[in-house]
Amino acid sequence: MYCPFCSANDTKVIDSRLVSDGHQVRRRRECLACHERYTTFESAELVMPRIIKRDGSREPFNEDKMLSGLTRALEKRPVSMEQIELAVNKLKSQMRATGEREISSEMLGDLIMAQLKELDKVAYLRFASVYLSFEDISEFADEITRLGKEKNGKAKKAKPAKTAK
């Protein structure tokens, strides 16, 4: 690596450690020519899959677009920006884990809906109303009923069984 101070090519690594939950390496370096020290950060360059839109067109993945959609759905809900950013990172990991170079916008929408369902049910309904193109109030009611059944089903499973004494 070239020294940022004197442009010499010989530098040595003094210290290396993982940062950002193991997603980056922080290296402390020293130039062998001018003896200046500086810090570098290294991270893997991960390529996100392209998105295949409903009309068949393709576009590069746009993290800002996904973040704004999540933020819009979660507007005025008790979810912190940190939780939203964690959700975005989880979604990006899920997209990369498919191993595909391209994924459909439907698949991405399904991943987003699953993430919103975990974060906030009201935000999930907001997003679903647009994503699933609800036509009337009965479709809202059906989705709310489905959410209620899922919640009740999980609650029943979570309760420990009573034992006789």
Curated annotation (Swiss-Prot):
One GO MF term attached to the UniProt entry: zinc ion binding
Matches recorded under InterPro entries: ATP-cone_dom (IPR005144), NrdR-like_N (IPR055173), RNR_NrdR-like (IPR003796)
Co-factor note (free text): Binds 1 zinc ion.
Q: Where do the zinc-finger regions (unnamed) map?
A: 3-34
Under Pfam families, the record lists: ATP-cone (PF03477), Zn_ribbon_NrdR (PF22811)
Q: Which cofactor does it need?
A: Zn(2+)
UniProt superkingdom: Bacteria
* Residue stretches making up the ATP-cone domain: 49-139
One GO biological process this protein is involved in is: negative regulation of DNA-templated transcription
Annotated keywords = ATP-binding, DNA-binding, Metal-binding, Nucleotide-binding, Repressor, Transcription, Transcription regulation, Zinc, Zinc-finger
User: What is this protein's function?
Assistant: Negatively regulates transcription of bacterial ribonucleotide reductase nrd genes and operons by binding to NrdR-boxes.
Recorded family membership: Belongs to the NrdR family.
Which PANTHER family does the protein's record reference? TRANSCRIPTIONAL REPRESSOR NRDR (PTHR30455:SF2)
Q: Which NCBIfam families does the record associate with it?
A: transcriptional regulator NrdR
Q: What is this protein called?
A: Transcriptional repressor NrdR
